[in-house]
Amino acid sequence: MGTGKDGGGYLRAYNGEGDESAYVGTGRMGGGYIRTYNNSGRETSYLGTGSDNSGQLRIYDKLGETRSYIGDGYLQAYNQFGERTIFLGTGTNGGGYLRTYNFSGQESIYVGTGADSSGQIRIYDNSGETGSFLGSGYFRTYNRFGKLTTFIGNASDGGGYLRTNNKFETETVFLGTNNANEGLINLNDKFGQSFWIRLNKKN
C-alpha cells in the first residue's frame, strides 16, 4: 500500500512466492483500475478506466494475450491467434448488432439493425462476400462472384414471389403473384427471354 509517482494511492498483493498477483490503484491519467496476474507474472484481467476515460474490462489468456473485452457499449472476443471472433454492441446509428469472424479475422455473420433501422442477417462466404441476406421481408442469395441468384420476398403491391437468376444475374424463373393477384409461373432462357408462361389454370 502506498502512493505512486503521480500522487495516486495503490495496493499491491503478492502470492506465496513473492510475485505480484493483484494491483488496485490509480493510473497515470487519474483513473482507477484493478489488475490481476497469474503465477507466471502474466496479466490475466484488467478492470478500470481506459485511455478514453470510459470503463472497460479485459480478460487475458495464460500468455497475457487479450481474449475478451467489454467497454464503451460493446463486447469483443479474440481467438488464440489474436484475431477478433465476436463483436456484440451498438452501432453508430444507435442500433444493436452481432458480428462473428472466422479464424483469420474475416467477417462471417452479421445479425442486427440495418441502416434503415430494420432487422437483418447477413451470411458471408470465405472470401468475405455476402452469400445470403435476410431482412425487410425478403431473402437473397449470392454466388461467389457477388451476383444475385435467388430472391424470395414481398412485392411492392404486397404479393409474394420467388425469382432465380443464372450466374450472370439474368432472371431464369419467376414464381409468384402477379398484379391481378393471381399465380404466375414464367421460365426464361439464359438471355432472360420468356419461353414458357402460365398465368392461371385455364392457360
Region annotations inferred by a language model:
Residues 1-203:
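Parallel beta-helix/beta-solenoid repeats that form elongated, surface-exposed shafts/blades used
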